[in-house]
């Protein structure tokens, strides 16, 4: 099989196999070909990963931050040097076209490692003067962390979680999605090649039961999950039993508001990026596109032209712009949402069908005349299906944009920057864009509010989620006791 790794797991600095675990077939979604076969982590594999991580963490935390930074920077350089082959593997694992994976996946992971390498040596505490006494604070690592990844950006997510954890002196056991398990193994190999001591980044494969075993282990201090809201609820509850630190980056049903003074081509381009990039399988997608009534029909006409011109096909073809969904199960789910939208009265503007057999393809799809009550406007589809809703006033757009249990992201397109800032100040979302969409530089915090999650990834804000503060009171005089 063309993408078979050396072993299913990577523990304590080397590949580890245990073929008694349940098989995990890895399917290339463009063709249905089985490209690798892994095995689920057994209790022995899980124990080895947790034990080696706990054992290695103390010495790593004691290392000078600048030395930790050098290792992470070398890992970043190695990723960039091997970006082409890593991107090819990402395409086979996910079905995303090379046109995307070459610029968006491992490249973002390398950025994260480099950014947190630079941040590690400058994370400091503070001094609080109290007369002749004083208090100083120390930012300390949490200890052993568990990362649980999603299948849509498997390698990027692994890097986004590993980079701050390792830079700040923690160890991590990472469980990728069983749907896209290959990239995390490569990251583990790269980190060892860069000089990371064994045990600090371990990878174990498996489904929900493996994740549950990791999350509930008494040695684990922190859990970081990227996934769906139902999965997040379960993991959050399990982590709470041990009063563990958590970061949850969950689902979204994000609004993209287009006012009638917006640059139409830019707004349409953003709506397409926010619905069709990665075949629509992005948590922050702006899947509720609110368009002011005066420009709605012009917006839809031009959108249909551009959507129909998207090149679909073999993800390994560098000219292809959109690949398949990640799996047959996801394809069936998305097609069911399309049929539901038809049944509930949505006006199909373009797409709406499965495409390019035998892979898991669906056409870029746009529904107009969508109302807030329709399923398409309320539930996360996670496929290339855009809902276009119209509005009249700014106040109406804000109220309807916020009328959701999600709060991951939002976007505003307008030529009036005063209005843009006024609107985003009222949007209930963790990440907002003005005249742009779905750009997530590692220098900026990323995360949601409401059911879209807690905590933040990336930026300086991530430091708070992988460290804890110790306060030290220093008495400079005799103790004055009343007895």
Curated annotation (Swiss-Prot):
Cofactor note: Binds 2 potassium ions per subunit.
Binding site for NAD(+): 149-151, 175-178, 228-231, 251, 283, 380
Cofactors: K(+)
SUPFAM superfamilies cross-referenced by the UniProt entry: ALDH-like
Pfam families: Aldedh
UniProt GO MF annotations: betaine-aldehyde dehydrogenase (NAD+) activity; metal ion binding
Binding positions (K(+) 1): 27, 93, 179
Catalytic activity: betaine aldehyde + NAD(+) + H2O = glycine betaine + NADH + 2 H(+)
PROSITE patterns: ALDEHYDE_DEHYDR_CYS, ALDEHYDE_DEHYDR_GLU
Positions of modified residues (Cysteine sulfenic acid (-SOH)): 283
Protein EC: 1.2.1.8
Biological or metabolic pathway of the protein: Amine and polyamine biosynthesis; betaine biosynthesis via choline pathway; betaine from betaine aldehyde: step 1/1
Keywords: Metal-binding, NAD, NADP, Oxidation, Oxidoreductase, Potassium
EC main group: oxidoreductase
GO biological process, one term: glycine betaine biosynthetic process from choline
Active site: 161, 249, 283, 457
Domain of life (superkingdom): Bacteria
Binding site for K(+) 2: 243, 450, 453
Description of how the protein assembles with itself and partners: Dimer of dimers.
The protein's role, per its UniProt record: Involved in the biosynthesis of the osmoprotectant glycine betaine. Catalyzes the irreversible oxidation of betaine aldehyde to the corresponding acid.
Family: Belongs to the aldehyde dehydrogenase family.
Stated name of the protein: Betaine aldehyde dehydrogenase
Originating species: Cereibacter sphaeroides (strain ATCC 17023 / DSM 158 / JCM 6121 / CCUG 31486 / LMG 2827 / NBRC 12203 / NCIMB 8253 / ATH 2.4.1.)
């Amino acid at each position: 099989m063309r993408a078979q790794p050396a072993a299913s797991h990577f523990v304590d600095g080397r590949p580890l196999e245990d073929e008694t675990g349940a098989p995990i077939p890895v399917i290339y979604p463009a063709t249905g070909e089985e490209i690798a076969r892994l095995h689920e982590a057994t209790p022995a594999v899980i124990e080895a990963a947790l034990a080696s991580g706990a054992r290695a963490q103390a010495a790593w935390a004691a290392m000078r931050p600048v030395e930790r930074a050098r290792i992470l920077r070398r890992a970043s350089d190695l990723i960039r040097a091997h970006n082409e082959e890593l991107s090819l593997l990402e395409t086979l694992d996910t079905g995303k076209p090379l046109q995307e994976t070459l610029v968006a996946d491992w490249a973002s992971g390398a950025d994260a490692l480099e950014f947190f390498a630079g941040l590690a040596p400058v994370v400091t505490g503070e001094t609080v003067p109290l007369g002749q006494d004083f208090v100083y604070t120390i930012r300390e690592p949490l200890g052993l962390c568990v990362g649980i990844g999603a299948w849509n950006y498997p390698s990027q997510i692994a890097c986004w979680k590993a980079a701050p954890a390792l830079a700040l002196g923690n160890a991590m056991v990472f469980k990728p999605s069983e749907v896209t398990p290959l990239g995390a193994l490569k990251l583990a190999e790269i980190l060892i090649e860069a000089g990371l001591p064994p045990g600090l980044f371990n990878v174990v494969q498996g489904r929900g039961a493996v994740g549950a075993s990791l999350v509930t282990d008494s040695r684990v201090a922190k859990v970081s999950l990227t996934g769906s809201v139902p999965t997040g609820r379960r993991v959050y509850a399990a982590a709470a039993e041990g009063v563990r630190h958590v970061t949850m980056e969950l689902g979204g049903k994000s609004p993209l508001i287009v006012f009638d003074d917006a640059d139409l081509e830019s707004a349409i381009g953003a709506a397409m990026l926010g619905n069709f990039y990665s075949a629509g399988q992005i948590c922050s997608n702006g899947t509720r596109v609110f368009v002011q009534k005066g420009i709605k029909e012009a917006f839809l006409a031009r959108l249909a032209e551009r959507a129909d011109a998207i090149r679909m096909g073999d993800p390994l073809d560098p000219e292809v712009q959109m690949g398949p969904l990640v799996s047959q199960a996801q394809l069936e789910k998305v097609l069911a949402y399309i049929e539901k939208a038809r049944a509930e009265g949505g006006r199909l503007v373009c797409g709406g069908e499965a495409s390019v057999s035998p892979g898991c393809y669906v056409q870029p799809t746009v529904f107009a005349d969508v109302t807030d009550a329709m399923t398409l406007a309320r539930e996360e589809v996670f496929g290339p299906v855009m809902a276009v809703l119209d509005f009249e006033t700014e106040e109406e757009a804000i109220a309807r944009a916020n009328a959701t249990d999600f709060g991951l992201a939002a976007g505003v397109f307008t030529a009036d920057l005063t209005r843009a800032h006024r609107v985003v100040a009222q949007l209930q979302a963790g990440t907002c864009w003005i005249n742009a969409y779905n750009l997530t530089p590692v220098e900026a915090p990323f995360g949601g509010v409401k059911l879209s999650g807690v905590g933040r990834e990336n930026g300086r804000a991530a430091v708070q989620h992988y460290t804890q503060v110790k306060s030290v009171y220093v008495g400079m005089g005799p103790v004055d006791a009343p007895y």
